[in-house]
Regions:
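Short, conserved beta-strand edge motifs with alternating hydrophobic and charged residues
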Residues: 22, 67-70
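Hydrophobic side chains in well-ordered alpha-helices
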Residues: 31-34, 102-106
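Amphipathic N-proximal alpha-helical interface segments
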Residues: 71, 75, 142-143
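Vicinal oxygen chelate
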Residues: 2-14, 18-26, 57-60, 67, 79-105, 128, ...
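Serine-centered coil/turn micro-motif
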Residues: 75-76, 121
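Short, charged/polar surface micro-motifs in flexible loops or helix N-caps
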Residues: 63-66, 73-75, 99
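Long, hydrophobic N-terminal alpha-helical segment
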Residues: 5-52, 76
Length: 146
């Protein structure tokens, strides 16, 4: 299986920065309170992303962001993740100028994709997910620059 990172066989994806780290949680309200107490995190956006079956809270932590994800149903990707692994880091999201172009670049290099084309995500931005097989074990999200 091709690997997107250490040997450079796929990409490079044109990344402008890390948009957020996604954390799967069982209870969104409790997690928001915990992160607020822990590091003064403040909610920037809180919304439901129906397409992905999650309620999310995007928290500002210094210069970075954490996206807390609570599953709306057990039979969603985040619900299955929570069932399999419990709460914890779910994905790393990279900000890119053009999600579709980066997906094409990855597909041409043989990367395993979860999404073949962009779909709506948090804040109405286009997003797409790259399978952990292509990244050495980490679920990666591409997020259109806002």
């Amino acid at each position: 299986m091709p690997n997107a990172c250490p040997d450079g066989s796929i990409g490079p994806v044109r990344v402008s920065g890390i948009h957020h780290v996604g954390v799967a949680v069982a209870d969104l309200d409790a997690a928001v309170a915990t992160w607020g107490r822990l590091c003064g995190a403040e909610v920037e956006v809180r919304e439901t992303v129906e397409d992905q079956g999650v309620e999310t809270a995007l928290l500002r932590v210094g210069d970075g962001r954490i996206e807390l994800l609570a599953s709306l149903e057990a039979d969603t990707p985040v619900g299955k993740f929570l069932d399999r692994q419990g709460p914890g880091v779910h994905h790393v999201a990279f900000e890119v100028e053009d999600v579709a172009a980066e997906l094409e670049r990855l597909a041409a290099g043989g990367a395993e994709l979860i999404d073949e084309r962009p779909r709506p995500g948090l804040e109405g931005r286009e997003v797409a997910f790259v399978h952990p097989h292509a990244t050495g074990g980490v679920l990666a999200e591409l997020v259109a620059r806002g």
